[in-house]
Amino acid sequence: MTGFELLHPGVQHHVVNSLGWPGLRPLQDEAIAPILAGEHVLALAPTAGGKTEAAVLPLLSRIATDGWRGLSVLYVCPLRALLNNLHPRLERYAGFVGLRAGLWHGDVGASARNRIFDEPPEILLTTPESLEAILMSTRRDHAGFFAGLQAVVVDEVHAFGGDDRGWHLLAVLERLSAVAGRDLQRIGLSATVGEPERLLRWLVGSSTAPSRVVAPDMGSAAPPELTLDHVGSLTNAATVISRLHDGEKRLV
């Protein structure tokens, strides 16, 4: 049985008829079974490789099939601009099975945040800092808000791994698990990383649940182009570099 066949019938229908896809990409198909089984997953694919759908489609199936209620999935990104870009797409996907996706970050107005608290969507796109603000608030019932939380997707997880903001994210995830009263499924999305197993172990934190790296497309990535040029001296190297991209910013 393919991963696609494991999806909720409503999700299957809209993948074919609303999105018009002839099939799923290898990453998307391979990620379905472990995500449906509740495993922690690190999904790796090149840019525009369908990572968002690899996480969201099986999670929508879990919400619809397992009867999750209230806020069930957090979709965490490092940048507000990325959240703003993703929100309409996730709203559309959630609507395939009668669900909703909301947006919460520092630029979202108070009235919109109040509506989310009053009627939580099944999926919430947000940042680590916004999650901490909710947890720290004394004016909101964060325990009730996160009571039904089941899974967290961390997009661009390599941008968090190992630095101060990443450790802050892990602390927030551990606190969310404590508030929800369950081990939250963690799904990381990333492009190429040097040590995927290490990044997965970092993301999983204190959880002992099964975990795996899903990266069927990475072996076919094009090798980087490398050109060697002998410049003779450090001074000459500086001159050559300065002329390569005159007037443009470059990281050397």
Residue ranges of model-derived segments:
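Conserved pre-motif I regulatory segment
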Residues: 1-44
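Walker A/P-loop NTP-binding motif
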Residues: 33-41, 53-68, 89-91, 174-177
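Pre-Walker A (Motif I) flank of P-loop NTPase domains
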Residues: 37-43, 70-73, 121-122, 185, ...
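Conserved SF1/SF2 helicase motif Ia
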Residues: 49, 61-86, 179-183
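Conserved helix-turn-beta segment of the N-terminal RecA-like "Helicase ATP-binding" lobe
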Residues: 82-105, 202-208
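Conserved motor-coupling elements within RecA-like helicase/translocase cores
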Residues: 109-124
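SF2 helicase catalytic motif II
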Residues: 129-182
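Conserved interdomain linker/interface between the two RecA-like ATPase lobes of SF2 helicase motors
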Residues: 174, 185-252
